Each structure stands twice: as structure tokens, then as C-alpha cells.
């Protein structure tokens, strides 16, 4: 049953009702009042402090004359009337046990909110999912999705389609068994749950699963590709982003890395971690699944954004899905059946794979950059952060170009054995991270890169000192917007990547910019608040280079460019 209210908002050019910009997760906008010729005149219009520090990922929502803003832990939510944004209409500030923060990997972030049926759907780190009346903030329902006592927490932005709320838990670094959960939008009742590992019934494989590509694997593999019962603590959590095709009624997402990181402790392909899924929204049954990195040994959690487009393939308009994975590969597949069409390296520095075999879908590994116990891996590219992480990228349908925020970071990796203990980190590796080899001065760790999605080839690159963690926004005025870890919001010319405008915000940016229109005026919004995995050293005052799973050493200079904060800045002409 379709949500007419949400569908209306999705088709309203000036609204921003979904964290990724729409069902297709293209993160773009037809708004063009701000363009290349006048962007130099953009100024700060207003700002809002969340009153919370730590990393502020994601972006606010705009529905009608209301904006909804979230914060990092304790996951506060604020409703602002755009007629008077200085006044808070309502606020929801949950009380949570601070011990939850200790089991959250890589900062206490919150990636955003969802909207549907006149409700704001939010999650809390402590595993609770709630629906609030969008007008009053009253709690309509509240359910428990996951349990922090075993290391399972919520950081993902919920996703609403039709009468369903999709939600996944974090916690693969603590051995949490991943699953996608579907709840009734109006009641909060659990409709179905599909795990990443285990029996075919628990993974919810359709009878014709992977019938178009049986070489991807089909039945019984959620247990057979694991040693013993290791699949029960095998990770595969999904804390990233969803996309949805209303015509096919399929939704798409990625399951994450297997646990532990130490690959010696879990022989086998470890299905169905590291998989792109196409599932029926109503039943949760998987029509197809493509495992990008069998037996992942680098923490390349494949939960990143799935961008849906329709493009000609061999002369026929084809429904496609494109995905830049943490493993450094840009994939394009037929989203109806999972056929692999493109698999290209996003940067020449990628060395863990020599290539991806398009016939089998299997990556061809280079054993020199493996992480086995008898081999200390050095100069591994990408690092565990991936050449792409949680940032939301943008797509220009006219030029068929994807504008991506990338991390140009490599690593050394030393594994060690450890036992599983519920609620404790289950990693088994010590990492050192540092800039990749291809930057102009060999010190750059970030890129904004434009890709032709028909070929997977790069068009242009804009280098950044730090990882481009938050992703990009494309607006029809020909501008690519993004926030930087050192605190700038920037606008680039979409044709060549030339920087046309920037503004220094109060703290570093790890969220994804958004845009909306109100009373005939276009606005650009960007969260600020340094943190996330790159900012853990700054946020928690860590000095050991290997701390923060290797991030502290790579980003030790970040503290010289920005400090902690938390809020939203809004810009206009």
C-alpha cells in the first residue's frame, strides 16, 4: 500500500523528504536558482546548533514548511518552522544509558531521519526505533530492534517505502549477525526479518534466487561457506543506505563485513556478507544477491549507497544499479536480475584486486596484499576505511555522471587471534593508515571524482587534504556541493571540478549537503560536527597511531584545522 503523502513529497522539487534525496538514491535536485554564474553571491542565511558534539553525519529533512534536524548521540530530534527557523516547534531528547557509546564503532554518529504517513521515523543508538507525529513530536509507537548488550546498536537512517520502514543494526566489529528488519509504518509491528547469514529461510531466499546468475551461488551457502557455527557471530550488518524501485517493488542495500576481521578465524566465502541485495519490499524475499568480496579480509563493509538509474545497454533502456564499494570498485548491475555490467577500479592505487572477472563476478586477488596470519600486509590499498565509505554521492541524469566523495588512504595490517565475547570488540587486527600514493603532494587523502556511469571511467578529479567522507550533492544549476573534514562547504563546476565557492563552517563536515526551496528561494543545508571514523582521534583525544582502528595516525593533523561542534548551516543567495 503506497504512502501517498511520501510519494507527493518525493515528487515535490523543493522538498527533501528522504535522506538520500529520493527512492532512487540519486541525491540530486532540479533546483537551479543557485548556479555557476551567481554562486559567488551565496551567503550564510541562518544556523542551528544541536547542542551536541561528536560526528554529525547525514542531512536534515524538509517537508512543507518544516525542517527536521537530528544530532549525534543521544540522538536528539528538532522540528523547526522555516517561517521562523530560530524557534524550535518541538524537540525529542531521549534518555539513554551512556554505556551504549562504548560498543559503538567509530564514533557515536547518527545518519538521519525518515518521513512517512505524517510521521518522523527515528532511531536511537540503544536499539529503539520510534515514530513521532511530525506536527507535535508525540510518540506514536516505539519498538526495540537490536540489543547493545551484545554490541548491536543503531546508526542508520531509517528508510520508508509504501507502508514499510526498513532498519538495520550496526555491530559487525563485535560479532553481531546482520539483518534487515521491516516494520509496519503505522503500528511498528515487525513484518519480516532477513539475515545475512544462516539458513535459506532465515536469509529469505526466493525459490528463483539468482536464477539469472547461478554462478553467484544459490542455496545452502549461508551456512556451508562457514566453519561450524561461525555464521552465528559472522557479522554482515547493514548500517548504510537503501534504494527502492517502485515499478519492480524491489529494494536494494548492502550487507557488511564478516566478523572477525582476522580472516584466518573464518575460512570460506562467508556468504552472504559483502553482498548487494535485491529484495521484494513486501515479503523480504531475495530475488538476487551478488557477493562483491567473498571471504573479505580487509573490512570492506559493502553497505555504501546504491544509486538507481535507467540507461541504455546494448541499445535497450535498462534498469541499473551503481555502487562504489569500499573495496575500490565501481559496480554497475542490472537491478532487475543482478547481471554484472561494469566493474572498474575507482583509482589506479587499488591493489588488493587485479580486476573483477565480469563473467563470474569474482575479484582476482593479488596475494601480496592479503592479510593472512603468516603475512604482515603492507601498502594495502584501499585501507579498511575503503576508497568510499558512508558518504552519499550524487548523480546527474543529463550527463549520466556520478559525483563521488572518495578516501585515498592505504594501510598496513597485522592480524592476531582473539576469542569471541558478547558485547566486546571482535576484530583481531592492528592497522596503520596513511595517504595513498597518487595525490599531487603524496599527502592528500580525499578526492571528489566524476565518473561516467556508462563506462565507469573517471572524467575529472578534485583533490582534498582529508578524506571526502560525507559525499556530494548535485543541483541542476551545474554545481557539485560537499563538506570537508576540515570544515569547508564547497561548490564545484560539474563540468571540470573547478572550485567556485567555499565557506568555513564552525566544525568539520562529515554529512551530506541537501537543498530545498521555501517561498521561491533555494537554500543549501549542511550539517557540521567533526567526528566519525576519521575524527575519532580528535573527538576522544587519542594519540596512539593505531588507535581508532588505525584512524588516529592517518588523521593526526585534523586537530590543527578544526575542533568539535554540532549543528546545521543554511545558505542562500
Curated annotation (Swiss-Prot):
GO aspect biological process, one term: methanol metabolic process
According to the record, how does the cofactor bind? Answer: Binds 1 Ca(2+) ion per subunit. Binds 1 PQQ per subunit. PQQ is inserted between disulfide Cys-105-Cys-106 and the indole ring of Trp-239.
Q: Where in the cell is it found?
A: Cell inner membrane
Q: Give the catalysed reaction(s), semicolon-separated.
A: 2 Fe(III)-[cytochrome cL] + a primary alcohol = 2 Fe(II)-[cytochrome cL] + an aldehyde + 2 H(+)
Judged by the first EC level, this protein's enzyme class is: oxidoreductase
Q: What cofactors does the UniProt entry give for this protein? A: Ca(2+); pyrroloquinoline quinone
- Can the keyword Membrane be found in this entry's annotation? yes
Question: Which Enzyme Commission number(s) are listed?
Answer: 1.1.2.7
**What GO MF annotations does this protein's record show?**
alcohol dehydrogenase (cytochrome c(L)) activity; calcium ion binding
Main location group: membrane
Task: Kindly state which keywords UniProt assigns to this record, in alphabetical order.
Answer: Calcium, Cell inner membrane, Cell membrane, Disulfide bond, Membrane, Metal-binding, Methanol utilization, Oxidoreductase, PQQ
Q: Which GO terms describe its cellular component?
A: outer membrane-bounded periplasmic space; plasma membrane
Bilayer disposition of the protein: Peripheral membrane protein
Active site: residue positions: 299
Q: Where does Ca(2+) bind?
A: 173, 257
Which residues form each disulfide bond in the chain? 105-106, 146-169, 381-410
Domain of life, per UniProt, equals: Bacteria
The keyword Disulfide bond is assigned to this record:
yes
Q: How does it assemble?
A: Heterotetramer of 2 alpha and 2 beta subunits.
Q: Which family does it belong to?
A: Belongs to the bacterial PQQ dehydrogenase family.
What does it do? Catalyzes the oxidation of primary alcohols including methanol.
Spell out the protein name for this chain. Methanol dehydrogenase [cytochrome c] subunit 1
Organism field:
Methylophilus methylotrophus
